Amino acid sequence: MASQVNALLLPVIESTPLHQITKVALTTTLTSKQSDYKFKEIAVPLTKSLQLYEKAQRRQDLRASLKALESIIYQTHFQWNNPLPRHAHLFQKHYHFLLTHWPFENHRDLVDSIAVNNGKLNSTSSRSVWLKADWITLFNVKNPWVQTPPSLVRLSGTDLDTFTPERIFLINSLGNHYKFLIANSHLSYNHKKYPSPGVQIPIRNALGEVSPAKQIAQLFARQLSHIYKSLFIENPPLSPENELALTAVFYDETVERRLRRLYMRACARAYTTTNADSTTEPLMFHCTRWEVD
């Protein structure tokens, strides 16, 4: 199937006015050995964007044509051909640890604490708490709702609750990543505002009861899915290799100004890691500044 689809897509890609660096990245990604699922993840949205581009060209709709090309540029260099940063891989590796230690706020306990705090609501759900706090301290409490499967206990070579150096690196890198995106809201996908990342456990009824444990456990799973999607799919950091590749596009003297500006718009949300090779110090992030005439 992949070879048949590529036979249709590759000539269309070559006919677009995109820079050769983007065309090579696209071609390499499509023709590399991968599962049908991974191939479809790229081929389906790419086909849609190319169809939009061709229709816009036939209608001589310049705006729609440029929008389709912008989408292809962004998806190629930021998503399809962009290696995940180290803390994304560690997120997957230590998923169960994050699931059982992800910070939460139990509304039942919050209501009960009002009397103790002289009628004041002592909430930890505000973004300011997450921006100022040491994230390791926020992860110190293990939640009682997520159960560890026996199979995971048998397979694990380390204590599932131990704050290993790798897990500390992961948590602090996630904290830096979240704080960076909050501080640079112009980078967010669809101008999305990031709420507090803690799990909120609501009161179920007027009696103050909360949901069953299984439903609460699902809240943690959904929140981690949301966090992963926000940091690594919708707003992924640009890899150092891709940053260099795009810099080469911007500094290519043969590129027309209109095409350079197209790339500028497509890459306006670019940011990358300052210390991508670090394995001890948590990752830091900075906005990418493209110098374009």
Curated annotation (Swiss-Prot):
Top-level lineage group: Eukaryota
Keyword Mitochondrion: yes
Subcellular location: Mitochondrion
Entry protein name: Genetic interactor of prohibitin 5, mitochondrial
GO cellular component: mitochondrion
Entry keyword set: Mitochondrion
Function: Essential for respiratory growth and required for maintenance of mtDNA. Required for cell survival in the absence of prohibitins.
Record-annotated membrane-spanning stretches: none
Origin species: Saccharomyces cerevisiae (strain YJM789)
Family, similarity comment: Belongs to the GEP5 family.
Nucleotide-binding keyword on record: no
Principal subcellular localization: mitochondrion
Record InterPro entries: Gep5 (IPR031455)
GO biological process, one term: mitochondrial genome maintenance
Any single Pfam family the record assigns to this protein: GEP5
